[in-house]
Amino acid sequence: MSPNILFLQVDQLTASALRAYGDRICHSPALDRLAENGVVFENAYCNFPLCAPSRFSMATGQLCSAVGAYDNAAEFSAEIPTYAHYLRVAGYQTALSGKMHFIGPDQFHGFEKRLTADLYPADFAWVPNWANEGKRDTNDDRAVRIAGICERSVQIDYDEEVTFRAVQHIYDMARSSDERPFFLQVSYTHPHEPYLCRKEFWDLYEGKEIPMPKVSALSEQAHDPHSVRLLKDFGMLGIRFKDEDVSRAIRAYYGSISYLDSLISRVLDALSATGAAENTVVVFTSDHGEMLGERGMWFKKHFFEKALRVPLIVKAPWIAAQRVSELTSLVDLLPTFGSLAGSPAPVEPLEGIDLMDLLDKGNPPPQRPVYAEYLAEATPAPIFMIRRQNHKFISSSHDGIMLFDLAADPDELTNLATSEVHQPLVEAFCEEVRTKWNETELVDAILLSQKRRALVRDAMNTGQKHLWNHGEKETDSVLWYRGVQGYNEWAFDYI
């Protein structure tokens, strides 16, 4: 019998914040048990350090440049199969509880059921404009300044509903006459900023030494060009937060992880209570990481380890606990789910591989590279990343290149791009970028997509509105973000 698959996804969780990845203070007993009894992929990366595009590449097993979805307001075609499509063809009942950030009329992309509304807009509200990029109403320094304790926030409201619906679905499946195995994706918004948590989770870190950034805030001159643009976009350029502000934000981030852990525990308890745990693969990951003050940077949108490296844990009763050091990324999930489910062969080439091929190997396969890209706001040109063995290469035709040796320089402080001894490696990486991506064609496609979506957005905001959001109710425009309010006014609406 094919196994059930429970896919737990969180938002903006950097791998290094979990004990399974070396942290010393995180209180996350449910995730700790999952890691102790499962497979921990030590070097897992997202393929695009931004919420929606990361999910698109993960769902399709392809890079966003290949599926034509470039930012947080992009849709990918309904004809592109996702893991939900492949699993349904293999006989699975597929359901989604929580955030997936689908844009456009197709709000299912292969899922049979959606148990909640999405947290964010499904329209083109957030289309970037490379031709005339201005300050957008998104991340800003208030996320750090207001960090601390709250009783309730919109993110708490949302994740409580996500958990309730997921638990209810597990019980519904146990009572159902539907004999198909299930695939349930439970997708949370924590620990995404603002850095707020309830007092009971804040108090878990009383007396703990909160780990401060290893690399303190850099001067504008010491930052790479993309970091400077991001800091300008966040309204943080030239701001040096006090140590107590940084510590408070990081403590609240840990508190959010602990809160998240308590929700995940409820879902796992339901799995055990129904007996489904005996035949269920549990997969846990995040869409991307969080800079968390390193180099004076916050949030995501860059290729530094804090923003790019994500936790990836797979647990099943019949899979031996182990740690895998090979490079992996989120595009590997589609072929892995397909392998577990016995899905038909993919109809097109995929970027990812089956992670099960990396387990218990006396002779592990040669290390393949991991690719990532950034094609969204706050850049005038595509930025590409290749991680091959210990080296990370970041390339932008506008900004130049960076090369880091992560074994010798884990904090990514020494750019080796101009090092004479590293020139053969730099040239090889440059050639790999040219082979992997046709930048001229990609830029043309991105600019045209932005113009098209901006026009459609303006048209849809004129006259009678027809919303794409799944199951949209009148109150959703108040509860969840729909572009009616300013983003930060909505995100910081807490008590």
Identify the meaning behind each predicted range.
Residues A417-K465:
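A contiguous, mid-protein "functional segment" used to position or interact
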Residues M1-S396, I401, P410-E431, Q464-I495:
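Formylglycine-dependent sulfatase
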